[in-house]
C-alpha cells in the first residue's frame, strides 16, 4: 500500500505512475503483437475484420474499465480518510454493481451484435470473421470486469506493482495463446479472442488469491456485498457511471467515425488500425498520469490536503507535456517504420495514410494531455458533470465530422477530427477547474 498524502508529490507521482505505465505498455505491446500475428498468419482480410470492430469492443470494455476506476475513487477516498471498514465495503459493492453491468452488457451485446456490425458498415466480406471475434470478447466481459475491479482497488490503496506483475503474466500467456490457437491449431481470429479471455481469467484468479492473502483489510464479508449503505451507493454510482459514460461517450464518437472509415476501403481500414495502435502507445502517458491523478486527488481530498492537490496537477501536466515532445520527434523520424512494424504491410496507401495521421495528430497532443490530467483530477475531486459535458462535446464533434468532413475530404477528414474536438473539449474543463474551491482555497 502507498499513502499518497505524505512525501514529495514530484517523487510520489512518478513512482506511483511508473508501474501503471509499464502495465499499460505491456497491454499495448500485446495489442501490437496480436495485430502482427493476425496480419502475418491470417492475412489482410482477418486484420481488417478485427480492425473494423476494435472500436466496438473498446466501447464496451472501456465503459467497464471507466466504471471500475470510478468505483475505485471512492475506495481511494476511504483509504485517504483511513476508514478501512468503508474501504472493504466499497470493494464488495464494486463487485456487485460491476457484475450486474457486465451481465447486462453481455446479453445486450450478443443479442444485438449483428445489427450493430451492419450499422458500423463492416464490409460484407468481413462480417462473419468480425462476428466470430467480437462475440467471444463480449462473452468474456464478466472476466474483464472482475480483473478491472481488483486492479482498480489495488491502485486505490497505492499498490500499482501487483497489477503490473499480474498483467505481465497475462500478456505472456496471451501471446503464447495466440501462437498456439492461430498458428498451431488454426482457429483463426476466434483463436485470438479465446486467448484474450483465457489469459484474463488466469489474471483474475492470480489477482484475487494475492489480494486475499496479502491484504486482510480487503477480505470482504457477506455484509460487504449488500447494497445497503445509501450514501456510499449514491457516491459509487455517481462516480462509476460518470467515468464509465465518460469513456463511452468518447468511444461512441470514435465508433461513429469508424463507420465512415469503413466506407473508405480495406487499405484505409488497415492504415487507421495501425495508426491508432501506434497512437495508443504515444498517448499512453496521458492515461497513466490521468489514472495516477484520480487516485492522488482522491486520497488527498479524503485527507483534506488541498495544496498537495494543486501542486500534483501542475506536476503531472508538466510531465505529460515533456512526453508530447518526444512523441512528435518519433512520429516525424520513424513513423513510417512503425507502421510497417505493426502491420507488416508494404502497401504505399497504408504506409502513407497511417504516417500522415501520426504526424498531424502528435502536434496537438499538448491539448489532449491537459484534458486527460484535468478530467481525471476532477473525477478524483468528486466533480462528475463537467467531465461528462466535455466527453459529450467530443462525441458530438466526431459525429458531426463523420457526417461532413469525411465524405468531403476522405481520410484527411478523419485525421482532422481529433485535433478539432480536443480544442472544443478543453474549454469547459479549464473554465470549471479554475473555479473549483479546491483550486482557489489557500492553505
Please tell me what each predicted stretch does.
Residues 47-107, 144-163, 271-330, 335, ...:
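Small-residue-rich hydrophobic transmembrane alpha-helices
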Residues 29-48, 117-124, 180-187, 248-277, ...:
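Helix-terminus/linker motif at the lipid-water interface of multi-pass membrane proteins
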Residues 4-42, 55-70, 74, 99-106, ...:
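N-terminal transmembrane alpha-helices
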Residues 1-17, 75-140, 184-241, 297-364, ...:
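Short alpha-helical transmembrane segments in multi-pass integral membrane proteins
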Residues 14, 18, 30, 67, ...:
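Residue-level signal for transmembrane alpha-helical positions in Major Facilitator Superfamily
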Residues 15-34, 136, 170, 199-203, ...:
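Transmembrane helical elements of multi-pass membrane transporters/channels
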Residues 20, 24, 36, 73, ...:
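Transmembrane alpha-helix boundary and packing residues in multipass membrane permease domains
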Residues 68, 136-155, 163-171, 192-207, ...:
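Short runs within selected transmembrane alpha-helices of multi-pass transporters and secretion channels
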